[in-house]
Amino acid sequence: MVKIGFIHISSSSLRLVLAEIEEIGYFRVVDELKTPMKICYNLNNTCKVCNEKLHYIISTLKTYESLCLASGTSNIIAIATNSFNQICDNEIIVKSLKDNFDLDLRILTPKEEIYYNYLGIVKSLNVENSLVVEITGTSTNLTWVKDGNIEEWSVLPFGNINLTYNYGLNDRILSDSIDECNSFISNHLKDVDWLNNSFESIILIGDVGRNIAKIDKKRRRYPFDNFNNYELLDNEIHELYNMVKSKDLRQRRKIEGLEQDMADTIFTSLAIFHNISDLVSSRYIKISNHSLREGILYEFLDNNYDVIHDILDYSLYGILHSLNCNIDHANQVYKITLDLFNALKPLHHLDDNYLNILKTSSLLHDCGISINYLQHHKHSFYIILNSYINVLNHKELLMSAAIAASHRFNNYQIPVPQFSSIINKLDLKAIYELGALLKIAEGLDRSLVSSVKDVEVTLNDEEVIILLSSPLNLDVEIHQALRARDFFREVYDRDLIIRKK
């Protein structure tokens, strides 16, 4: 395992991300430090950073370097977004990084920013036809991603910082200023003719996306903190826009979920996105926590590691490796669960949309052992629920966690009331149906040596008969699997028969 540091200089902040990389190329963030700093706002009339601000930037970078050294980081990547080019004396910062830390600062072009945002997203989500929106301090980046490829892209010359201060929207918000700002945004959007196409969803990334998700989750009393792949509807964006525009700076600072350093720019952030969602024919909005930084990390991994290409498998096997789980057992339980799922389709009537849930729950069912074997099913529940697992939306993540937690032969109860805003009765039915199959599969590999080589299932009106092929004695496995018979009867209304062929 190695550690890598990532320093990111943007128009609104400096940020350090520390990540651990497993041998299989799986990374996980282990520390993150953000220093709010509206660099583009603090330029003086000659586009130079004032001495006080320059000293603060350099001292912050020294702190970042110290943190990297203390954590044993072996490699540091330093990048700056294109807004860095607005600083005419930026060579002072570049020279300081080189002289003090022996770091070469890479200043990205707009095209590179678009590409790395795209890479961060397609490595974490299945994107068929979406508009990707990033609102920075000085620009708005638009990317049309279709069938996993960049179809079109545009960079608009305004962001939340320059619009906020150009139109005096940092404190009290006057109606005339709102009208002028919205007119300016709308006119620029009309010049992007490819926005007239249809999109299945809009994916919002960056700090603006994270803050909108945090505000909306507080407003809805959302039951868990993970905001990657968080979903909203366009009318909810309009509600947030109308709520924020009625508040001055002091009142905005009290909005639950909003980071304090964005209180002055949150209105123009919403104004930009409000205009985009009005123009684009898509009701569905997703928030992605993966964007430019992750895109650069993925490129680094692809160049230096043999990375798993399936993005769901990348997450699942990465978690298995990092938690030192028994991967052979996980694979065997998944194989048997999948065989049972396919054989019992005439009974459960679940389609292939549940396959990602089945894979996640069966592969990660024992991940809680990394905390403690006792009650490990409960540990598995919250590990899965709080993990960033590619592809899965929040309902799928919750269902996967609940199914994994039900793999043992006990009376574990899913905390339904807490998550009633996410899952419904049909989801609960599917959880029980898949949970019953996982219980059987867990029992059929109780010896942890993949004894069962093949599973053959026959159905009738009263029974489900499972015939097992194996060169080994299966008495223990059959006994353990049959501990699920009462639950199976309750869920499938059939008696469970298991025997060796």
Task: Please report, for each region that a protein language model flagged, where it lies by residue.
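A short acidic Gly-Thr/Ser loop motif
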Residues: 8-13, 133-139, 205-208, 289-291
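A short amphipathic beta-strand at an alpha->beta junction
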Residues: 492-501
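Short flexible coil/turn linkers enriched for glycine and charged/polar residues
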Residues: 10-13, 70-73, 99, 136-138, ...
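Short, surface-exposed charged micro-motifs
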Residues: 6, 132, 454-456
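Hydrophobic alpha-helical segments and helix pairs
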Residues: 131, 136-139, 143-153
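Helical "lid/coupling" subdomains associated with nucleotide-phosphate turnover
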Residues: 4, 18, 42-67, 86-87, ...
